[in-house]
């Protein structure tokens, strides 16, 4: 159980780092942090959706769609990725 908590903590740490970088428009830094977050927990829906938004923000629409579709497959209900996919 302790190991699982550490993995989730690390994933959340890198998600928050990516969020901070995205807010200041450091998109390449945000991408690196969010990818690292997903290395620790590939089911981190918030990190995956934010990564999609960052990709979309830099004009990488196909990459954004990939992340949102994966997110939608991991959590089919109440997922903001559904909105993003419909509005691309």
Which residues fall in each region the model found?
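Conserved structural position within tetratricopeptide repeats
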Residues: 5, 35-39, 70-73
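TPR-adjacent "capping" and linker segments in tetratricopeptide-repeat scaffold/adaptor proteins
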Residues: 1-13
């Amino acid at each position: 159980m302790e190991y699982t908590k550490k993995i989730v903590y690390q994933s959340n740490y890198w998600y928050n780092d990516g969020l901070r970088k995205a807010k200041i428009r450091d998109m390449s830094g945000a991408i690196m942090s969010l990818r690292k977050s997903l290395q620790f927990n590939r089911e981190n829906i918030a990190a995956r959706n934010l990564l999609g938004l960052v990709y979309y923000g830099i004009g990488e629409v196909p990459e954004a769609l990939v992340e949102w579709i994966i997110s939608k497959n991991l959590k089919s209900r109440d997922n903001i990725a559904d909105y993003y996919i419909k509005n691309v």
